[in-house]
Amino acid sequence: MVNDSCFLSGLVKVKTKFNNHDQTSWRPKSVYHYIQWKNSSPDFLVDISGFVDVKLKAIRAYKSQFFDSNNNEPETLISKKNFLNDVINRSADLGRLIGVDNAEGFTTNRVIGINYLNDIK
């Protein structure tokens, strides 16, 4: 649905309005999907080794969404006690695939190009 929407948004004959004003057609150059919990094969990995602490701090900013032994809300994937450990372990496992400490995986429907073979880890 996201890829179709991005394609359609670039068609001149598709007319849309926002706040009663016509929108100009525009299409993003690329669409990348972050791999969350599905065991998907990434199309590429990004080294996040220097940013894991920042990522965890950002996640913890939403602490009401996560495990709280005093909470009576229904359990979700992110409210499980081991959620943060899962995040750390997943990034470490993906990092292992490219020889770094931590990585995040992404998928895309397009072919990715690089300038130099040496840029590939």
Spans of model-derived segments:
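Metal-dependent de-N-acetylase/amidase catalytic core
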Residues: 1-121
